[in-house]
Amino acid sequence: MRALGLVGLVGVANAVCPYMTGELGRRDTNPDATEATEEFLSEYYLDDTDSYLTTDVGGPIEDQQSLKAGARGSTLLEDFIFRQKIQRFDHERVPERAVHARGAGAHGVFTSYGDFSNITAASFLSAEGKETPVFVRFSTVAGSRGSSDLARDVHGFATRFYTDEGNFDIVGNNIPVFFIQDAIQFPDLIHAVKPKGDREIPQAATAHDAAWDFFSQQPSTLHTLLWAMAGHGIPRSFRHVDGFGVHTFRLVTEDGSTKLVKFHWKTLQGLASMVWEEAQQISGKNPDYMRQDLFESIEAGRYPEWELNVQIMDEEDQLRFGFDLFDPTKIVPEEYVPLTPLGKMTLNRNPRNYFAETEQVMFQPGHVVRGVDFTEDPLLQQGRLFSYLDTQLNRNGGPNFEQLPINQPRVAIHNNNRDGAGQMFIPLNPDAYSPNTLKGSTLKQANQTAGRGFFTAPDRTANGNLVRAKSSTFDDAWSQPRLFWNSLLPAEKQFVVNAIRFENANVKSDVVKNNVIVQLNRISNDLATRVAKAIGVDAPEPDNTYYHDNTTSNIGAFGHRLQSLAGLKIAVLASVDAEESFSAATALKAELSNDNLDVIVVAERFSNGVNQTYSASDAIQFDAVVVAPGAEKLFGAKSAANSSSTLYPAGRPLEILVDAFRFGKPVAALGSGSTAFDNAGINTAVEGVYVADAVDESFANNLEEGLTVFKFLDRFALDSDE
């Protein structure tokens, strides 16, 4: 891609603070953020250890039998214990989120890399090493709360900073763009992708007529759609996703100067994604897979980390790059504007109660702090800023949801907001209005020069005629999807083609299918032709209006080496009848002991040294598979159809090995276990297949190398013209 001259942007964020003015300096206290989280939330804990059961008002009770008129008589209306227990049960559930209902969360800490006061007045970025408590919620978008983690979908990545000047939320996704440009279209988008109104199916899926009808009629969706159809829609885990703020925001300094920025979270584990059949199988076997992975990783002390970066641009750059920076369907290629790292986030504490923390947390793009401001993005302005706040009234039955422990800031609250359902505070000021001259009742107004208040960028202006129209700078919906397509590896292109084929194979309307091909053809004739061939639509002639050969970096979900192997799982396929199986497993664990990997021994039944049985195992549970010596008898030619054992389904050991290879995972064998590869039809000369006589340093290193590659893309068939 043609690089643009950006002298003055690279390195604009530095550790020099030229703007230290204002009557109130930043709060200098910097307690350990992890301890601060525990100290704050512990005030709300209910600990039942060695306690008697009580009512909600504290009276000790027993609640295992209803009060009756005689042992066989009628239950009595006066039984307040029964009524309380049943009533509370009847009202446990609250309305789920309209979108992002399925999620998992964790606490952590953000550490600033330096003093960035030359680009923002935000206190949490004011000093090197400054720590800020955070809470992150990962999610899918379309599915209900009980849907699968493995649905192909955009994934939410919402982060709250509990800063010393109030809460700041980056309410983002794992994909840097969104489907629509104007928030007024949001109900249409969600109604289109949600289950059909007459039958409530399909759940957490877009493989249906309504979704693709909307996509083909609203070309702004195409860019995000391609990201979701690629590996980004089915990540390996929440730990292996990047995050993006999606919109362009403003950072504002103490003196009111501004920069435009895009927020990027970069996973320090490395990007990793699944392939579609693998994700489907996991969805059926363990729909909680990604929740479980995040929770267990943190419990084991394998704390996932992300780096917060920004792309920094001048106000004059709004239209500089050939698109509008306020269009949320566009990325700023890193060749145009490189990333500037601001700090690191570590998630190191699981919630103590899912409902109280992960379910009740409410994120809001309007949660901004001094030094952060909005832009004229029509998806952000009034759209998300209104909707995220408004929906909480429905979910919580009143306006006091900010008083829930997980939503409270870690600083004092002073305002004139009063009453409402569920009021938790006891305001001492009897005169809740401003301006106010009564003694003890005056709340001072905080602004740019007093009280370190929030302030809007002084140079922002609004003018123009009132029109219900889209800016012409938002019109091009095809050039950036083309850029995405051009930047993928051949195997990744095939994954996108396969995904769109799968989705549209479930579309019944020929009109919708033809419209889909029309839109795809505006991106790439190759893409459109390959999809059309599979879904019974005539291949189109090229529509080259938006065709170009530009590429950009850091687009695909594959082809990146993992930076950390912590928490990855290696299956050692063993047999309880072969002692050498367990000797090999023990040796492998010893060689890999410093890598924080899980080596899981799988055998026919539980015995000493066995972690899991074949009956409860599949290739989808593991990131690599090793066949141990002595286990080869389980992989015989007859084992695929019949089994002499009732302990596992016929062919299960062979199936695990074959599927691991098909899904692009590293596979290995030790000693006589290598004969299993013959029965599996695996060529030992291909990349990612390792054979050794015994465990040694070289074998362990090869296996680790295979895990960093994660997916060996040459195992996946490509269309012949690729």
From Swiss-Prot:
PROSITE patterns: CATALASE_1, CATALASE_2, CATALASE_3. It comes from Emericella nidulans (strain FGSC A4 / ATCC 38163 / CBS 112.46 / NRRL 194 / M139). GO terms for biological process: hydrogen peroxide catabolic process; response to oxidative stress. Transmembrane segments: none annotated. Occurs in almost all aerobically respiring organisms and serves to protect cells from the toxic effects of hydrogen peroxide. Residues 1-15 form the signal peptide. It is found in: Secreted. InterPro entries: Catalase, Catalase_AS, Catalase_clade2, Catalase_clade2_helical, Catalase_core, Catalase_haem_BS, Catalase_immune_responsive, Catalase_large_C. It comes from the Eukaryota. The keyword Metal-binding applies. It holds the Pfam family Catalase_C. SUPFAM superfamilies: Heme-dependent catalase-like (SSF56634). Its EC number is 1.11.1.6. GO terms for molecular function: catalase activity; heme binding; metal ion binding. Disulfide bonds: none annotated. GO terms for cellular component: cytosol; extracellular region. Heme binds at Y388. Gene3D superfamilies: 1.20.1370.20, 3.40.50.880, Catalase core domain. The lineage of its organism: Eukaryota, Fungi, Dikarya, Ascomycota, Pezizomycotina. Keywords: Heme, Hydrogen peroxide, Iron, Metal-binding, Oxidoreductase, Peroxidase, Secreted, Signal. Belongs to the catalase family. Induction: By hydrogen peroxide, heat shock, paraquat, or uric acid catabolism but not by osmotic stress. It catalyses: 2 H2O2 = O2 + 2 H2O. The active site is at H100, N173. Its cofactor is heme. This is Catalase B. The gene is catB.
